[in-house]
Amino acid sequence: MVSYVPEIPLREPVTVEKKKSFPQQKSGLHPRNRHRSRYDFPALIASCPALEPFVKPNAWGDISVDFADPAAVKMLNRALLQHFYGIEHWDIPADYLCPPIPGRADYLHHLADLLATSNDGEIPRGKGVAILDVGIGANCIYPIVGLREYGWRFTGSEIDPVSLNSAKMIVEMNPTLRNSVRLRLQKQPEFIFNGIIGVAEKFDATLCNPPFHGSEQEAQASTRRKLHKLGKGEVADKPVQNFGGKNNELWCEGGEEAFVRKMVEESVSKAQNCLWFTSLISKHTTLPSIYHAAKLAGVAEVRTIEMAQGQKISRFVAWTFHDAEQQAAWAAERWR
């Protein structure tokens, strides 16, 4: 088993007095991530004037938005997508997941580096690279960023018709996405790849933001902790998700461990259809179970890629059924 962990710069402790001191760059984000610098709110407002009412001085006197306010977070995302990725029309239904874009972008940049390891160190670019987004969600974030940064084409699967329709609307209303993003409804929710990947279809990688929690109560407890860190003190029994999220987006029976183990098990029958299978992993304690599942599945290689956003460490696990020689052959056939 191979574990790849990039160097992660340590963040200096911050002393809080009258005003909090923030670094000009966000510690740990991938070097190619467009969001390494602090948010330039005047520039974002120029691109998306609707953001302006949500921008105001915070408790430390810095210009920001209230990250505990779902409407503010949603509008910030809209501005970021318009300013950095040229997306003119973006919206999601109320209460659906509105993910922090810098972290999602990091996943894609590290995924690009992973594909480069199978291609003599060169990142494959263009529409010849096909990515499967498992659970694309209502927000369509991964295709938006992946297409802008690397020119990849995407297929997005989804079990929720409302999410799929939202993603479809985003694709249809933005000409840059129309010919590069396909959407598929998973009509059998008990499956992940079955019913989505065709018999002769090829994907260079899959990615997934799995439902992390094992129950609704666990998801709500996580939200309370986040709101407390944002300085909101006591919160309601059923707190409002600042980044949104419907049940199927946030939790499933057995949590991320059960979901990703199932993904590994299903990937066996799709071994020749995909070069790299990947999934985000929220909890470090989940990793041994995933490694064990990969060993039972007979994978050729497993990698753990760690990422950092400030003091928060995240990671994704990647596995392939192709050895080094087969990876090189795959790259030669599809990317050159």
UniProtKB/Swiss-Prot annotation:
Family: Belongs to the methyltransferase superfamily. METTL16/RlmF family.
NCBIfam families in UniProt: PRK11727.1
Stored HAMAP family: 23SrRNA_methyltr_F (MF_01848)
Places the protein is found: Cytoplasm
Glycoprotein listed as a keyword: no
Family annotation (SUPFAM superfamilies): S-adenosyl-L-methionine-dependent methyltransferases (SSF53335)
The protein's name in its UniProt record: Ribosomal RNA large subunit methyltransferase F
Transmembrane segments: none
Catalytic reaction equation(s): adenosine(1618) in 23S rRNA + S-adenosyl-L-methionine = N(6)-methyladenosine(1618) in 23S rRNA + S-adenosyl-L-homocysteine + H(+)
Record's keyword terms, sorted: Cytoplasm, Methyltransferase, rRNA processing, S-adenosyl-L-methionine, Transferase
Protein's job: Specifically methylates the adenine in position 1618 of 23S rRNA.
Gene this chain is encoded by: rlmF
Pfam families (UniProt xref): Methyltransf_10
InterPro entries on file: METTL16/RlmF, rRNA_lsu_MeTfrase_F, SAM-dependent_MTases_sf
Principal location class: cytoplasm
GO process terms (BP): rRNA base methylation
Gene Ontology molecular function: 23S rRNA (adenine(1618)-N(6))-methyltransferase activity
EC number: 2.1.1.181
Naturally occurring in which organism (per UniProt): Serratia proteamaculans (strain 568)
Domain of life: Bacteria
GO cellular component: cytoplasm
Iron among keywords: no
